[in-house]
Amino acid sequence: MKAKSLLLALAGLACTFSATAQEATTQNKAGMHTAFQRDKASDHWFIDIAGGAGMALSGWNNDVDFVDRLSIVPTFGIGKWHEPYFGTRLQFTGFDIYGFPQGSKERNHNYFGNAHLDFMFDLTNYFGVYRPNRVFHIIPWAGIGFGYKFHSENANGEKVGSKDDMTGTVNVGLMLKFRLSRVVDFNIEGQAFAGKMNFIGTKRGKADFPVMATAGLTFNLGKTEWTEIVPMDYALVNDLNNQINSLRGQVEELSRRPVSCPECPEPTQPTVTRVVVDNVVYFRINSAKIDRNQEINVYNTAEYAKTNNAPIKVVGYADEKTGTAAYNMKLSERRAKAVAKMLEKYGVSADRITIEWKGSSEQIYEENAWNRIVVMTAAE
């Protein structure tokens, strides 16, 4: 019976390693100090569609009223977030930028297109704690691209100036993103680029400087949330290793004992020995959900209780450094009842289960995180 108890305890301890990773508190660190899991290549993609107004800042255009210089500019982009705070995007911008010749308020049309690869930096996710349901994000970006002016026309529709002008561009911008749902965001974006497309109205300067302000929607594709990589609590791992090694030594010692029994002494009044087997279920912080890697502890205890017709006492706890005493009492109650429910699932009759909860009023271990537990005691 002692060997069975030791093996049961050894199996329970061997299943607690993955639970230790869930006890760390790195979820409260800024994104720059947090590592995230690599997801599938198809995850974290997005498409943005927007429209707004644009104008050219350079040359004689500045002599014309602000409103008269505004033209309609659509944008379309496709991109991917490689981290919660870093992404890349290929955006297409173009249509018409108005230009004004020297001394004239006659509106000329510069028909152009601009494709640019942007490097996006989410300041909110970088300097703040990552939250998948955060409503507001500030995202500056910079990029390089290719610009092409098809041709220019005057107010009468006659082609003027040069055509088929190609140039490299330097692009910068700022996006303000508002979360509407898991898959849709609303964006307000301002951007500008520098390139030499020979727009009408630029005085034949060294570069054209169009600016644009747009509003639109982003559609998120695939998985949108990020999962943190939580480091292991190595102090707890070492302690569990020591306990496992100690139990292995005891099992090895028992296995070396001779099978044959010595001569029995004269019969005496038998002494009843009460065998008590404890097992533990570890929980994540602020959670009463039993992780899959902890279910084996509940299963082993249930099997032991059924085999030995033993009652089970279930006691829930919470750590004292998280939450109030009243909240921890409720949390420990939910944990204890969750374990009792799973014991019933594995075949233990409800009338053989006693449930108690201590909240954070009693701390079994000096290590704070180790007290997020339910202790199961099966006694013959």
Swiss-Prot record:
Free-text function comment from the UniProt entry: May have porin activity and function in peptidoglycan binding.
Protein name: Outer membrane protein 40
Signal peptide range: 1-21
Subunit structure as annotated in this protein's UniProt entry: Disulfide-linked heterodimer with Omp41.
Cited Pfam families: OmpA
Alphabetic keyword roster: Cell outer membrane, Disulfide bond, Membrane, Pyrrolidone carboxylic acid, Signal, Transmembrane, Transmembrane beta strand
GO molecular function: polysaccharide binding; porin activity
